[in-house]
Regions:
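Conserved, well-ordered active-site substructure
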Residues: 95-115, 166-214, 223-250
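Zymogen propeptides
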Residues: 21-116
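Short, solvent-exposed aromatic-acidic interface loops
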Residues: 57-59, 138-143, 192-196
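Short acidic-glycine loop/turn motifs at beta-strand connectors
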Residues: 44-46, 91, 126-131, 159-161, ...
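Active-site-adjacent helix-turn-beta-strand microarchitecture at beta-sheet edges
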Residues: 93-167
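Bacterial N-terminal signal peptides that target proteins for export
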Residues: 1-8
């Protein structure tokens, strides 16, 4: 029998050599940028399942994070993050291109009109496998992209590393805003302001702080975030399209 005092050094060596348990990843954080408060959530499509959601099997619009989460739980999945994802009509149906699970439920809207959606150029956030992008609408149509998920909104905040020329640094409209940007074809950054900000300040956040060469405005007045890692669950107005990150329940 080996004496305990001879086993102790070996046991200690094994203990310190063992890898530490991985800390749970928190994709969301609160930040300040040029005096304004934001919450940002960053994901990688190579590892994270980013999807769009609108209605259940009965064609009833989810309308809330709670309803969506409950539906996912029934499928053995859970919601890690969610945000409103595009503008919609009085029935809470998208007013622009909407693709879910490879099925196009609404075609691209290229009409002119009033409001932020029609503040050209507008654009499309899309996900296809491990790739994602924010693409100006006309370019998206010209390239004939067929992603698994897509939502159209407007205006584009950043295009090719430049702030949308229709967004001026002299703008005075201050609102809560949320949007999405993509870099390197797979890093997806979502942001929501925690206080009213101008379009230019919001666009600058994506270009300078989040390093996204392309970014899209999702909405303003109804902006909402579900981030359980931050104990945040916004419950404001009923929503239309929702973007979420999902994982299988263990």
């Amino acid at each position: 029998m080996i004496p305990l005092r001879r086993l102790l050094p070996f046991a200690l060596m094994l203990f310190f050599a063992a890898p530490a348990a991985a800390a749970p990843r928190n994709p969301c954080q609160d930040i300040e940028d040029v005096g304004a408060s934001y919450t940002i959530c960053v994901f990688d499509t190579r590892n994270d399942s980013i999807r769009l959601f609108l209605a259940d099997a009965k064609d009833e619009v989810y309308g809330s994070f709670s309803a969506l989460d409950a539906a996912l739980v029934q499928k053995g999945e859970k919601l890690l993050f969610a945000m409103n994802a595009g503008m919609y009509d009085e029935r809470r149906l998208p007013i622009g291109l909407y693709v879910e699970g490879g099925h196009m439920e609404k075609s691209a809207n290229t009409h002119s009109g009033a409001g932020n959606f029609h503040m050209k150029p507008n654009g499309i956030f899309w996900v296809e496998g491990a790739r994602a992008g924010v693409t100006e609408t006309q370019r998206f149509l010209k390239e004939r992209l067929h992603p698994a998920y897509a939502t159209q909104s407007g205006p584009m905040l950043v295009l090719g590393g430049r702030i949308n020329p229709r967004i001026h640094d002299t703008g005075t409209s201050m609102k809560i805003r949320n949007g999405v940007g993509v870099r390197d074809g797979h890093i997806v950054a979502f942001a929501i302001s925690n206080q009213p900000v101008t379009f230019h300040a919001f666009a600058t956040l994506f270009r300078e702080r989040l390093k996204c060469p392309d970014a899209l405005f999702l909405d303003g007045s109804i902006s909402a975030l579900y981030a359980p890692s931050l104990a945040r669950h916004d419950r404001f107005r009923p929503m239309g399209p929702i973007v979420g990150v999902v994982e299988r329940m263990r």
